[in-house]
Regions:
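N-terminal intrinsically disordered, cationic/polar leader segments
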Residues: 1-114, 118-120, 124-126, 138-141
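A short acidic/small-residue loop/turn micro-motif
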Residues: 133-135
Length: 141
């Protein structure tokens, strides 16, 4: 059975002039030709529950899957507008992502993934996002 390896991630997102940087512990594992990185989202407040995010990094496609209090799925493939969804205790909606850039550079369990996309909620443009995900295998793993 393959081992989950501890990694550190740095997630940098830019949207509407706002920069958000998160540095989080995570775990990574290769399954087939894809790298899976799992981490727990920081809780927004005392009433918020846990949400675990899995990032599936393929050769030319990226998928974000969230489970827990928030459930969502987004898929990113260069030049493609792909469907997704968002569900929380407070709201549900269908969305899609139109990926303008996707750059995947991996070396084993470490690497950088950068992508930009336009988000559509119910087919209405909702915003432009630029994301950078750095993955670094923990020393001594």
């Amino acid at each position: 059975m393959p081992q989950h390896t501890p990694v550190r991630i740095r997630l940098h997102s830019r949207h509407d002039g706002e920069n958000v940087v998160q540095e989080l512990p995570a775990e990574a594992i290769f399954r087939g030709s894809s790298l899976y990185v799992r981490y727990e989202d920081p809780q927004e407040g005392p009433q918020s529950g846990k949400t675990r995010t899995t990032v599936k990094i393929g050769k030319d496609e990226l998928k974000l899957i969230r489970h827990g209090d928030i459930q969502s799925e987004q898929t990113f493939k260069l030049g493609s507008k792909l469907p997704g969804f968002y569900r929380s205790p407070y709201m549900n909606f269908m969305m899609s992502t139109d990926t303008g850039q996707l750059d995947i550079r991996l070396d084993g369990l470490s690497g950088i993934v950068e992508w930009t996309y336009d988000l559509y909620v119910y087919e209405e443009f909702s915003g432009h996002f630029e994301i950078s995900l750095s993955i670094q295998e923990e020393q001594g793993s």
